[in-house]
Amino acid sequence: MSAARSVRDGRHRARIAALQLLYLRDVGGGGADEVDAAIERFWAENSASPERRRLAMSLFDGTSAALDRIDPLITEAAANWRLERMAVVDRLVLRMGTYELLEGSAPTAVVIDEAIELAKAFSGDDSAPFVNGVLDGVRRLLESAEPPRPPGTEEPLPR
């Protein structure tokens, strides 16, 4: 295996782990102590290199901490879809992909392609095109001059 493919594969596996951790937090509920215990159990049951674990935790922590920036972007890009009505895995893939687009450490095309692959692997048949469309919309919003406003802060339209 080439070095580039090995790095790519390691980053892909880190994204899978981060998605699983986000799912544990989202579906498991509970407080911070329960989430921390679930994360410790996850790592005890799933071996990973220190680099993969670091990247997975960075994606998990970054996504979790930036939801106030992430969710308005997804809501704006996913016209006619409310976050709470999206399939859980789709919502989590979109959140993590949006975080990566905001962070900018990976090329946009790679982030969107990885999100599509996660949707194909862990969600329904219609998920990949949905994730592709929404993240492309997020990409356009981020490239535009004015980012979307959080819900409820829109200025009234002129009459």
Locations of the language-model features?
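N-terminal interaction/assembly modules
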Residues: 1-159
